[in-house]
Swiss-Prot record:
Stretches of the chain forming a coiled coil according to its record: none
Gene name tied to this protein: CHI
Descriptive protein name: Chalcone--flavanone isomerase
Family: Belongs to the chalcone isomerase family.
Pfam families attached to this UniProt entry: Chalcone
Catalytic reaction(s) noted: a chalcone = a flavanone
Site (Important for catalytic activity): 106
Biological-process GO terms, alphabetical: flavonoid biosynthetic process
Pathway: Secondary metabolite biosynthesis; flavonoid biosynthesis
EC number: 5.5.1.6
InterPro entries: CFI, Chalcone_isomerase, Chalcone_isomerase_3-sand, Chalcone_isomerase_bundle_sf, Chalcone_isomerase_sf
UniProt GO MF annotations: chalcone isomerase activity
């Protein structure tokens, strides 16, 4: 696979490769961007988010359908991001705080978005409700100052591993705060970031730009580094 570069988002550095908690595989940085909200005419940045995909598995899987597409084509196509979310390869998401958040603030917002999406799609059951409760429980005792990180490993069988870091590193052998077996939740957490109504359009643009380069390199056998994608709000 072609080499990839690091990405810096608001002073937060996402290295080109990570080995996430709960995984035996290296993951490459697919893209990164801010998550923010418009408040009284000002764009307030809350978190920097990096999305990593399993080396040796993600690019060949995505190439079957998306090889030859430009960055703009990928960025505009909800089906591309759906394939990233549901693809048969591991994903790893690192959420690093720009502003402080409590665990309850973060997990309440994520589960609220997930439950709303499930109910709208008619797929909400007691199993999803129980998974959302486990997710909130894992976050309850934690608070996240600027620079602290939340680490999600999304496995193809549908296990969401949750871990925490006091900084932007991914600690070797990090102990998971929770491993939640629920495919809907495992996919929904990532979908809430890069899906059709994802909270980080900047991360989506970055992923589209970088993955289109990697797909091009895969098809031509080129090993040049993926171009660093501009990451703006």
């Amino acid at each position: 696979m072609a080499a990839v570069s690091e990405v810096e988002v608001d002073g937060v550095v996402f290295p080109p490769v990570a080995r996430p908690p709960g995984s035996g595989h290296a993951h490459f940085l697919a893209g990164a961007g801010v998550r923010g909200v418009e408040i009284a005419g000002n764009f307030i940045k809350f978190t920097a988010i990096g999305v990593y995909l399993e080396e040796g598995a993600a690019v060949p899987a995505l190439a079957k359908k998306w090889a030859g597409k430009s960055a703009d084509e990928l960025a505009a196509d909800a089906a591309f991001f759906r394939d990233v979310v549901t693809g048969d390869f591991e994903k790893f998401t690192r959420v690093t705080m720009i502003l402080p958040l409590t665990g309850e603030q973060y997990s309440d917002k994520v589960t609220e978005n997930c439950v709303a999406a499930w109910k709208a799609a008619g797929v909400y059951t007691d199993a999803e409700g129980a998974a959302a409760d486990k997710f909130k429980e894992a976050f309850k005792p934690h608070s996240f100052p600027p620079g602290a990180s939340i680490l999600f490993t999304h496995s193809p069988p549908g296990v969401l591993t949750v871990a925490f870091s006091k900084d932007s590193s991914v600690p070797e052998g990090a102990v998971a705060a929770a491993a939640i077996e629920n495919r809907a939740l495992c996919e929904a957490v990532l979908d809430s970031i890069i899906g059709e109504h994802g909270v980080s359009p900047a991360a989506k643009r970055s992923i589209a730009a970088r993955v289109s380069q990697l797909l091009k390199a895969e098809s031509t056998g080129d090993v040049a580094a993926a171009e660093p994608a501009p990451v703006s709000a």
